A protein has these predicted regions:
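A beta-strand edge to alpha-helix "cap/lid" segment located at domain peripheries
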Residues: 2-21, 25-118
Length: 118
């Protein structure tokens, strides 16, 4: 898969943009209908939880240690470290992106709080 690192880095960055995180319409363009997230808070989120009354916080984020594993021609795993500069919290992140109808959608995401700099 050509340019996989750049493609999925950009998709993760879009997912983290405040204008996307605060728009149910924009989130619906990224999240798969069967999306599931195990949040860093320990809460489980599903796509149906994101509606006009619930959007994500518009925090300032920085991605590092970004890695892509191509699982198949239509499925990719991304892993990275995320620094939330607003909340001053570090997390380890993993996402599974699936390609459906020629569009990549976020199917699964997990955040795990860490104090480790590795």
């Amino acid at each position: 898969m050509e340019n996989a690192i750049q493609t999925f880095y950009e998709l993760e960055c879009i997912h983290l943009k405040s204008e996307v995180r605060t728009s149910a319409e924009e989130l619906s363009n990224i999240l798969a209908d069967d999306y599931v997230e195990f949040g860093s808070s320990g809460r489980v989120w599903k796509r149906k939880n994101y509606n006009n009354n619930h959007v994500l916080s518009p925090d300032v984020f920085e991605i590092s240690h970004f890695h892509v594993d191509v699982l198949s021609s239509d499925c990719v795993l991304t892993t990275y470290h995320l620094m939330n500069h607003t909340a001053e919290k570090k997390t380890l992140r993993s996402s599974i992106w699936r390609k459906r109808e020629e569009k990549w959608r976020l199917f699964f995401h997990q955040g795990t709080v860490t104090n480790d700099d590795q």
